[in-house]
Amino acid sequence: MSHNFTESYDIIVIGAGHAGVEASLAASRMGCKVLLATINIEMLAFMPCNPSIGGSAKGIVVREVDALGGEMAKNIDKSYIQMKMLNTGKGPAVRALRAQADKELYSKEMRKTVENQENLTLRQTMINEILVEDGKVIGVKTATHQEYAAKAVIVTTGTALRGEIIIGDLKYSSGPNHSLAAIPLADNLRDLGFEIGRFKTGTPPRVKASSINYDVTEIQPGDEKANHFSYTSRDEDYVKDQVPCWLTYTNAESHEIIQNNLHRAPMFSGIVKGVGPRYCPSIEDKIVRFADKERHQLFLEPEGRDTEEVYVQGLSTSLPEDVQKDLVHSIKGLENAEMMRTGYAIEYDMIMPHQLRATLETKKISGLFTAGQTNGTSGYEEAAGQGIIAGINAALKIQGKQELILKRSDGYIGVMIDDLVTKGTVEPYRLLTSRAEYRLILRHDNADMRLTEMGREIGLVDDERWARFEIKKNQFDNEMKRLESIKLKPVKETNAKVEALGFKPLTDAVTAKEFMRRPEVSYQDVVQFIGPAAEELDEKIIELIETEIKYEGYISKALDQVEKMKRMEEKRIPANIDWDDIDSIATEARQKFKKINPETIGQASRISGVNPADISILMVYLEGKSRSISKNQAK
């Protein structure tokens, strides 16, 4: 078929949400000519649900995006109204930052970045069709019948694919926040032969701030201590006049209202068909599933400095509007609250992620990538993490360079993508610290140490950023060496100091590092014995040093496991393997292998339903094939 291409790009990104902006920025910064197409420019990097960035596991993803050279961390550092470090009373593996965002400012700042980015064109247009020839992407077609050529296309449409909003018995075609739904593109993806799923998510009502009685709620302030998502942000720019959130609860009256109206709840009446998120259920779902709970937490979260809208986190619902009003008014502090927006559920199409490679390129069509909620995930942070990887790999493919695959030991982004492409998902996927087996080495405080070098190699970390990173890394390395080299001896003078600090005296000579392994001994305590470092150390470097030393034994075990898995990941499986040619593997394993087509032995071993015996048989088969090929080549 001949095409009348009016414009030509290296990469076209469809959708300008959190995945789309990261994908387009990464690819354009790598030198590709990129078109970022969106149904509505006003909704670029918009937050249709919660007005926040970060949280458990998610905050670490934001730092990983930043370390690779992405934008989300920098953008939230320019637009937050509250910053808080979570889980400070727990171990370092689960600590993470969370920021309350000024949602309008967040979108505005990101738009400014996108509009000023070299090689990147932003355009409001609806893409109806992805053009494919001989199994390869060649471009797209718009609703206005314009055809644009492209070497790669990245689909980041979020919840817009055949989106439908549901409130009570009302159901209508819509994308997020009542924007247009992408119906022709959804049809096109089906026609291209992709297996499509149907998921659901939801959002709570918004209430007017001046109508809330805050006196009967519990204040939730931000942190006074400076913290940032981006490693480029400075402590002196930390916002001091932060806006608090407030805590309240549902009660017996709230639960009775919901119980009495379950017959009108789309979740239970059969109107909602899509699968909802397990870890962010609607309030009506919570009341049914956790009937023994007397109350549920609700956080009142301001949506910005210049708006009266307050997001009622924990009250996601698609109940009819009249029921929502009664429900809101049953809650302490909201007795007279004005509802500014009604909560709703949204159903949407998504691509079942087992059809993707770990680069986020589809297996079916060369040059077609997908990222974000299109792949079955939930959350802005998960979307951004996939977006930057899709953008990087689309650019690398076009440039004929080696693809980037983040391993599970590299970061939470690697964990998420591996989970999606290896295990698939039957519900909106959310990142949790429990999903990461190497979480002690995937911490919020070492994301830059893990990924900045990758970002530099790809071309997303500039000279200034790299110079700052090298200074930090050198300071860290030098101080660790110093702590390993200086010995504390059990002499009278030293032990007098040790006991004065309230610690048990030394019985043997130990290095400063060994002394610091004691749970009660801090870096600052050790400095009293060995003096300060040659250069003054930033507080965050000290935190990193303490964590690495105090958890060294656990970290060492984790790194040993990583090495074992690395060897399995290096054993590649040929793309043209005939799974029916392998004798003795279990039927379930054969079926899963055919469906997922794992690329490495490591990936094959993580597929549910595949046991160690199947992996052993597969390895014997591959070794036999390899020997056979070697013999034939030797003849």
From Swiss-Prot:
What's in the keyword line of the UniProt record? Cytoplasm, FAD, Flavoprotein, NAD, tRNA processing
Gene3D superfamilies, per the entry: FAD/NAD(P)-binding domain, GidA associated domain, C-terminal subdomain, tRNA uridine 5-carboxymethylaminomethyl modification enzyme MnmG/GidA
State the Gene Ontology BP annotations.
tRNA methylation; tRNA wobble uridine modification
Sites binding FAD sit at: G15, A16, G17, H18, A19, G20
This entry's Gene Ontology molecular function terms read: flavin adenine dinucleotide binding
Coiled coil regions, renumbered to chain: none
Q: Which SMART domains match?
A: GIDA_assoc_3
Q: Which cofactor does it need?
A: FAD
Subunit details: Homodimer. Heterotetramer of two MnmE and two MnmG subunits.
Functional note: NAD-binding protein involved in the addition of a carboxymethylaminomethyl (cmnm) group at the wobble position (U34) of certain tRNAs, forming tRNA-cmnm(5)s(2)U34.
Q: Which PANTHER family match?
A: GLUCOSE INHIBITED DIVISION PROTEIN A (PTHR11806), PROTEIN MTO1 HOMOLOG, MITOCHONDRIAL (PTHR11806:SF0)
| UniProt similarity note | Belongs to the MnmG family.
Name the chain's protein: tRNA uridine 5-carboxymethylaminomethyl modification enzyme MnmG
